[in-house]
Amino acid sequence: MTTNTVSRKVAWLRVVTLAVAAFIFNTTEFVPVGLLSDIAQSFHMQTAQVGIMLTIYAWVVALMSLPFMLMTSQVERRKLLICLFVVFIASHVLSFLSWSFTVLVISRIGVAFAHAIFWSITASLAIRMAPAGKRAQALSLIATGTALAMVLGLPLGRIVGQYFGWRMTFFAIGIGALITLLCLIKLLPLLPSEHSGSLKSLPLLFRRPALMSIYLLTVVVVTAHYTAYSYIEPFVQNIAGFSANFATALLLLLGGAGIIGSVIFGKLGNQYASALVSTAIALLLVCLALLLPAANSEIHLGVLSIFWGIAMMLIGLGMQVKVLALAPDATDVAMALFSGIFNIGIGAGALVGNQVSLHWSMSMIGYVGAVPAFAALIWSIIIFRRWPVTLEEQTQ
């Protein structure tokens, strides 16, 4: 049974399976944001010191995405997914057993290795397995898995960490990954590598100024977001002075708003990706600039989080669609670069937030993040006027 002859129901079921896998991977990527204080207390460290773990994870993904993708470019995709899930699960067992912060970081590097491959191939696989004419909706479903990781995975992981210890959070993620692995084995067909590209693809991609401009925009806007987002949990408790339960609720609200962004993109993304991305960057800029002023009210922070979540989902989806549209002949290479560049931004933002918190004041993370957000807004306006990309419509 091939991906071309199955019913629409089976095709959607396979996409949903990938969306569940995306939920699992993004839960483990995001969940340390809600556990920094608990992990710091466990190892008798400062919260900002533990936060460097976010940078290490992200930069390992950034460094290894392209090499791993090229090393596995000829590997059948179902087998590859199974292997990376085995690494993912084993690494979470080590996280659960971590007897020092160093061991925890090593276990997270193992997770990052699996992550590097997963996000290099997932978007293109979702498009391959989607029913005819439903590629944008398939990408939106994968993004919904990402959003659910924030709206359910991150808060639930935080709650588990609060009541049973942060180690149980990682153990539970490992169990969830095992169940997902069994579903992948059952549901996915053989998936020969297609349009994966090779090192020969790199010079071709690098000669596409529109694509390179999207990559630059990605790293700048993601740096802006993660400068503040990485430390939102200690910010809410230590700067705003609100309870740990409110911090959990705020993370849930921000993630839930991402689902709204996913729905908006599913309806408008095919025709208006450029406008949506620029508008979302402007919205992110406003949210970051107002983060500290909004900290005097739970309601203000809640409303801000809704718009923040919508903005980041629109940005992430819009960038992804444009990358796929601008590199249809080497989707896996292009997405490996995108994943790596995205994680450079995550690591850079977490590092900036770390340095601001240690050497200045955690209260300033929003203002500092607004600086690259403003630069990203200007750059997006410039590049979308110079290269008014409509190619995303051709991928549908």
Curated annotation (Swiss-Prot):
Belongs to the major facilitator superfamily. SotB (TC 2.A.1.2) family. This is Probable sugar efflux transporter. It is found in: Cell inner membrane. It comes from the Bacteria. It is a multi-pass membrane protein. GO terms for molecular function: carbohydrate transmembrane transporter activity. Gene3D superfamilies: MFS general substrate transporter like domains. The chain crosses the membrane at residues 15-35, 50-70, 81-101, 103-123, 136-156, 170-190, 209-229, 246-266, 275-295, 299-319, 333-353, 364-384. GO terms for cellular component: plasma membrane. Involved in the efflux of sugars. The physiological role may be the reduction of the intracellular concentration of toxic sugars or sugar metabolites. Keywords: Cell inner membrane, Cell membrane, Membrane, Sugar transport, Transmembrane, Transmembrane helix, Transport.
